[in-house]
């Protein structure tokens, strides 16, 4: 789903809004399908872009933002996040935990839930 990122590089706010609306509709289809088969989803991103289209002076920003990105767990099974924030290296151990698979000691990230 690169559309919000790619459109964010253009600096066009209107195009970014449309891209996010399309992305939202696509994600809804995936979520509905996964939940229908009792699956789980971890939804996140590696960086922002369309979330910060202008700087404080009103100039167009076309670079990736350094804002924190959400990590959303979607499932019929409740889980508890054990940290308020994390890093990209934490996503793989968290996925393995959800899949009930062992987390290799070589992984440097932490599981973000219990």
Mark where each language-model region is.
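Feature captures the catalytic ectodomains and active-site-proximal regions of enzymes
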Residues: 1-114
